[in-house]
Design a protein with these regions (language model features):
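Short glycine-aspartate micro-motif
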Residues: 185-187
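A generic structural signal for short coil/turn motifs at secondary-structure boundaries
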Residues: 100-102, 257, 358-359
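Residue-level detector of conserved, function-critical positions
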Residues: 1-180
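Short linear loop/turn motifs
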Residues: 78, 128-132, 260-263, 360-370
């Protein structure tokens, strides 16, 4: 099996080895020889990698369990590929399988394609500089079955999931139009700098909505289950986290400055996720969506926001759980029309599982609790 690429492979890369992630210096499971005349790579020996957790080669990591047919050592000439307007084309032997390894690049805007040997496209995707940032230094690609990360410099990560619309082929080579993800769902929870001035105002009223402090996501679909989990604290940029809010979620302004991720990178990722998700799920999820959308517009501008092209189905576990918890509504104004109040996340969780969940008001803990509640509520409704 050969892997052919353009002549923009790094000329100093003569040989690569693949090993388990935790054992970089031993137990090699595959060797790749760079063949300059063929402008690509020839796989010299190839053991089965599907059971290997987190294989890695020379600082270029593969995350998760990756099927052996998509272990591909991409090593690009960054300046020529990512800074040009060319479309890099990757041909992977005679591979026409249904699984396509995702690839993440950085450029002003660049369209990539993966083709089979008959020049039929298996996948294509576009990344833009606004969404994922830009750097020519210390790039490290993480190539996985469902998503990819970039390490821009040191340990500063930006996250992106290249949701691919692709023209695939079945085992007999017949084309199948569609997407590798079916019914993509995004579970989301946020922690913020405070509360909105008016809950009823739209997210476009930016002064009304608080800033994002922490956001956690669980992304899944019908075909593959959970595709990604992300837990991100944002580095404050032009605002600060009030002590009153920090007392609730435990993230002080100094901590966010120290450990937070670049705001633009996180926002670019969130915009990609929202623009590709079919369903968005959470507890009091309208609040989370308004906060995230307002932040996307602050960073990118509404004219560049990708999520505006998507009409999501929104599912709120708070509303789903109201008639399960049946907590009396003591509000004089709404009691007659709504005898039960909306449950807090922990109230719903306790009702469903007869226990409290830990680390409340941590976005990752909250989104996991909402995820568990959603599927338990679905089970009870069957």
């Amino acid at each position: 099996m050969s892997i052919l690429c353009w002549d923009n492979m790094r000329p100093d890369c003569k040989r690569w080895k693949v090993s388990p992630y935790e054992e970089r210096n031993c137990n090699w499971v595959a060797v790749f020889d760079f063949d300059k005349e063929k402008e690509g790579i020839v796989i010299e020996e190839h053991d089965k990698l599907s059971e290997t957790e987190n294989p890695s080669y020379g600082g270029y990591d593969i995350v998760g369990k990756v099927p052996e047919e998509i272990i591909i050592p991409f090593k690009w000439d960054y300046a020529r590929v990512f800074y040009s307007e060319q479309n890099p084309i990757i041909v992977v032997g005679n591979y026409t399988g249904k699984k396509v390894g995702n690839f993440l690049g950085a450029a002003n805007e660049i369209k990539c394609a993966i083709l089979d040997t008959n020049q039929r496209p298996l996948s294509s995707f576009i990344f833009d500089r606004v969404s994922i940032g830009w750097s020519c230094q210390d790039l490290r690609f993480h190539i996985g079955n469902y998503g990819a990360d970039i390490n821009l410099a040191k340990d500063e990560f930006i996250y992106a999931v290249p949701f691919l619309n692709y023209d695939s082929c079945d085992e007999e080579g017949h084309r199948i139009w569609g997407t590798p993800f079916k019914n993509l769902r995004c579970f989301i929870d946020t922690e913020t700098t405070g509360l909105p001035i008016n809950d009823n105002l739209p997210y476009t009223e930016l002064d009304n909505w608080p800033h994002l402090v922490q956001v956690a996501l669980i992304i899944e679909d019908d075909n593959y289950g959970i595709l990604a989990k992300r837990n991100m604290i944002l580095k404050p940029d032009g605002y600060s986290i009030p002590e009153s809010s920090a007392r609730i979620h435990g993230i002080a302004n100094a901590q966010a400055i120290k450990v937070g991720e670049d705001r633009k990178h996180v926002i670019g990722f969130l915009d990609q996720v929202l623009s590709n998700s079919n369903i968005v799920i959470g507890h009091n999820v309208s609040f989370d969506l308004n906060v995230v959308k307002a932040e996307i517009i602050r960073v990118k501008g509404i004219e560049n926001a990708l999520f505006t092209t998507k009409n999501h189905n929104v599912v709120d576990t708070m509303k789903m759980g109201m008639n399960i918890c049946k907590i009396p509504n003591l509000s004089f104004h709404t009691h007659m029309s709504q005898p039960y109040k909306y449950p807090k996340l922990d109230e719903l969780y306790y009702k469903l599982f007869n226990k409290h969940f830990n680390n409340q008001h941590d976005a990752m803990a909250d989104v996991q609790a909402a995820y568990d509640c959603y599927y338990e509520l679905k089970r009870k409704s069957q």
